[in-house]
Amino acid sequence: MNFIDYDFIEIGTSDFDTLIQGSEDQFGISIEPVKYYLDRLPNRKNVKKLHCAVSFDDIERDANVYYLKEEDIIANKLPDWLRGCNSLNKYHYQHEQLNIKSIVSVEGVKEIPLAKILVNNNVRRIKKLKIDTEGGDCFILKNLKRYLKTKSNIFYPKEIIFESNELSDPNLVNSTIKEYEALGYKLRYSDGYNTCMDFKKPEKLK
């Protein structure tokens, strides 16, 4: 197999603050379940744009994604950050909090385990793994850990950054950090918004 070393993989992009937007010659994969937002991201020659959701429970299935289109946000004078408030198989809590379920768009999407995405795209090294899935980040990382434990540590992402805000269970965040520290990661920061960890062990091919 011809493995590919990636500069980044980002899971859950919306259409702002993305790695693909700042990428020029980098190799990457940008994964987003909302096609409306994925299509608004720039096309880069070395970056794959994948329209799917990364499964929280490692099961492949058909699903629905709940989101707001930008024109509906503007027409209803809603805050712009709602572009990033999307949810799998249910309304986002902001949709309910703001009483805007009537303008939420719902579309079908495929949920795919992260390990399958990595294998299908011949992924080996990953310099940066960025996850922002509105509450599912720790579940994805726990699934990823099982995959990584079957590989040499050359497959371990060098940097992992994931969302750890009010949508995240603090106990789950802490247990995820501890599990990755056991793999050789060192916590750089966890500030109530995001958590960042760096892999510190020397690479081993086997």
Residue spans of the language-model regions?
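Structural motif
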Residues: 7-9, 29, 125-128, 159
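S-adenosyl-L-methionine
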Residues: 46-115
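Short, flexible/disordered intra-domain loops and linkers
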Residues: 77-78, 167-173
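SAM cofactor-binding core of SAM-dependent methyltransferases
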Residues: 1-69, 164-166
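Short internal loop-to-helix segment that lines adenine-nucleotide cofactor pockets
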Residues: 1-6, 87-151, 168-171
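Binuclear metal-ion centers of metallo-dependent hydrolases, dominated by the metallo-beta-lactamase
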Residues: 171-206
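Conserved beta-strand signature within the Rossmann-like core of class I S-adenosyl-L-methionine
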Residues: 154-164
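A short acidic, amphipathic alpha-helical/loop segment
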Residues: 18-24, 40, 140-147, 175-179
